[in-house]
Amino acid sequence: MSKQIGYTISTLLGLTILVGCADLTVLPGTTSQVSLPYLGQEPPGMEPELFAPGIVSHPDFTEYSGTFSPDGSEYYFYRVSDASGSILLFSKFVEGDWTAPEQLAGTAGYGAYAPHLSFDNQWLFFAWNHPVPPGEPGFPAYFAVERTGTGWSEPRYSGQGMFLSSDRDGEFFITDMSSRELDDRTYVAKVTVSDGLFTNYERLDIQPPWGYPAHPCISPDGSYLLFDVDGGSYLFVSFKNPDGTWGVPVDLTSHGFDPRAGGAYLSPDGKYLFFALLGDIWWVDGSVIENLRAVE
């Protein structure tokens, strides 16, 4: 199949019903057979590298976003194929090796994507095309599972939005699409989360020179926010000012990033930046962003 690039609303609408997901977990062998962090990958430098080729970034499928647990021992990501739609996969570091990616229990039957683990490691949020409770806003909708003594709880509805991100202080950010049918645009918003439920949205005063912001990624220390435009391309960063306002967005394509890159997320320590490009996940040293503070 041909690689897909990023995702759009029409793409996500096509992921509602899944059939035969087994092919999406194809891997060489039963475990990755590696003992290093980040699924055994050597950390990248200042030039982007393909992340975990053959394990996460697979030539036969499309991968877009993922999330690491705060201690780095778990990784969740989603994979898409033309035949089977989208499934949420995870790998764990167990007894010195990373396990082969497998589907998250309880999510089969509906497209699942854009996972995010909270910094307290107690909640896993993911967009899911499962029907929402009566009277609640629907697509795109987030659901959450709470960590238990034996794994994860049953999924529960969280609220509407796309591409959740959070920092160490427990502040969450999301793509607010609640008025899209009225103004045909998206917003980046701070969202209050209580017991896995989205209770309030506060739109941020961040506006790129063109397009509408989406897919926010807050840094672990909350000092900068990455986002993209045009449905998953053209990455920008906005640095937080001392007074708490957000600075003018910086176009990362002016600093060497491919304009087709989008869907950014960071390692829990902020050392590495991940992003989607041409249907795969790439990563690069996070200082490429930090170094822009002195320039911009």
Model-found features: residue ranges?
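Short, conserved micro-motifs composed of acidic
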Residues: 27-296
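Residue-level recognition of alpha-helix boundary/capping or hinge positions
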Residues: 6, 21-28
